[in-house]
Amino acid sequence: IQGVWDKRTITPLERPARFENRAFLSPEEILEYEAASAEREDGRPLDFSRTSISVHDPDDLDYGSRYVTTGQTSLVVEPSSGRIPAYTEAADKRAEEARKMREGRGPADSWIDRNLSERCLTWGVPQGMLPQPYNNNLKILQTPDHVMFYLEMAHDVRIIPLDGRPHLPENLRLWHGDSRGHWEGDTLVVRTKNFSPKSNFRRANVALETEERFRRNAEDQLEYILKIKDDTTWVSEWSVSYPMERSDGPIYEFACHEGNYGLLNILSVARTLEKQERENK
């Protein structure tokens, strides 16, 4: 499975309501979907009448232009609805408690108030393994006893042992979780647990566990299956599946800290507003 792989696709993560219970599109519908997507992205101007303009220029975004070759109506394949399961009461309670903790404290008191991706630290696991608005390349390197995933987005690196060693003790928690891999025939299986409470994947708790499967089902295609389990967050397990396409191009540097004016400006504006408020008293 070694090589550089392209995760881009315009296929939605969850099945749109208009497709209801349909798991796949016809070839004709795929062509129509791709044409409509291209029309939306072609020279779209920013709407400066809005109170907040887009973070990125449309030319900087690169979702790709192709639907997945499988024709599935969503990347979510389980449950059969193609939709992410509902949150548990515990997950809703955690979200409400987090909201209350932020009351009276602005989201820009400090750089630590901003999320990990805004701070150029990590896009996270398994979020980084899913298609993104840009930087969708994944480089895989293999040795007899390790596999390395180098993600273009946020220059995330995952080094995964294949030698059968046990997982770390549960009190050791990592942003990317603790991954262990093994081969089942021609399929690489990676299981990850021990996520840090600082990780943030769709409200998931430290109980989050994932299983990833990588199988080269064609010379230029890598099948990826992601199973997600956290019974403190979702009412049932759910799975994502999609094919990555081989890329011949290199992965260029992801320079984020060097040009992270967004974080600087957020904090600077917050301090300016606080100063104005003090002066107006």
Predicted ranges, named:
Residues 1-281:
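PEST-like low-complexity, intrinsically disordered acidic/proline/serine-rich tracts
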